């Protein structure tokens, strides 16, 4: 009897986690350095082909802790077109998700003063799985224990991005359809930021990201990054949902510290650690760790021209779009 009670509790808990996971999108601390995850209009802004990776580990020390690994490709094509691809593996307990997304964008020049509008589209497929095979029970012959369910979901998304050499503002719906099998809600994203050169070597870059879905609290991330030339950077990000953004002690939020440096001209590495604050404060095991790696190849799919997009000079971050210094 106790075995079935425990099994029901485990099933109920992880199914609810799976449902919550289906409702909520992935959230990376390095969103300002790699934004095609939530907006396809960000691809194709750099001259060189780039390959980047983000790995996020949460609740270290707990069995079945959330783990997300991702790889992103970004390339500029002819005629102000850009293309990108994302591969993401996400695991939590007995649930897993393998995602592939193809992003394409067209960058429209609005005037001669570097005002531009990007239009993006995303096509994606996501394989969701929930399996208790990896869990240990006394009676392994019980057919209820060997439970596995799988769904493959296709979707489409859209994005807009307005930007100059000083600021940007974007809006996107990365997954338009709302599949009922995993109770996934349509999310709306609004992001923006600006850059200001403090002197010849230092640049400050505040950013924000607002995420909203029906019948869920609004999620807000606010970050400030400080860049020293093209060599290293550090910053801080605060995120919370609902009233937690205004009153962290009321419903909890998270605080992240971000840093990174350029190892060689073509390779950048970043790291961030996130701690829960407010009612979610716990042990050090509840912290999340994230590693960011970006490799900018020497490969250019198109030749540079006077009509090309402004070249970004800080770690390949398309949000900044710094002007070249003499």
What are these regions (language model features)?
Residues 1-2, 16, 317:
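Serine/threonine-rich low-complexity intrinsically disordered regions
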């Amino acid at each position: 009897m106790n075995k079935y009670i425990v099994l029901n509790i485990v099933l109920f808990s992880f199914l609810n986690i799976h449902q919550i996971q289906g409702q909520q999108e992935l959230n990376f601390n390095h969103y300002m350095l790699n934004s095609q995850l939530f907006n396809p209009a960000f691809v194709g802004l750099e001259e060189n082909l780039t390959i980047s990776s983000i790995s996020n580990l949460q609740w270290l020390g707990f069995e079945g802790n959330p783990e997300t690994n991702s790889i992103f490709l970004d390339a500029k094509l002819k005629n102000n077109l850009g293309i990108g691809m994302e591969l993401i593996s996400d695991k939590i307990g007995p649930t897993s998700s393998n995602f592939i997304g193809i992003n394409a964008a067209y960058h429209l020049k609005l005037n001669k003063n570097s005002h531009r509008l990007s239009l993006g589209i995303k096509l994606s497929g996501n394989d969701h799985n929930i399996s208790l095979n990896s869990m240990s029970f006394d009676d392994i012959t019980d057919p209820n224990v060997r439970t596995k369910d799988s769904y493959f979901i296709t979707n489409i998304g859209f994005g807009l991005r307005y930007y100059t050499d000083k600021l940007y503002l974007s809006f996107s719906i990365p997954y338009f359809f709302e599949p009922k099998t995993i109770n996934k809600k349509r999310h709306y994203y609004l992001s923006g930021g600006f850059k200001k050169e403090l002197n010849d070597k230092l640049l400050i870059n505040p950013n924000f990201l607002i995420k909203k879905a029906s019948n869920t609290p609004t999620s807000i991330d606010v970050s400030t990054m400080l860049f020293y030339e093209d060599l290293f950077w550090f910053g801080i990000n605060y995120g919370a949902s609902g009233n937690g953004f205004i009153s962290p002690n009321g419903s909890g939020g998270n605080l992240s510290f971000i840093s990174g440096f350029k190892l060689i001209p073509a390779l950048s590495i970043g790291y961030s650690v996130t701690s829960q604050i407010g009612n979610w404060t716990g042990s050090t095991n509840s912290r999340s760790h994230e590693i960011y790696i970006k490799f900018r190849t020497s490969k250019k799919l198109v030749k540079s021209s006077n009509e090309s997009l402004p070249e970004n000079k800080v770690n390949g971050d398309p949000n900044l779009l710094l002007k070249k210094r003499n």
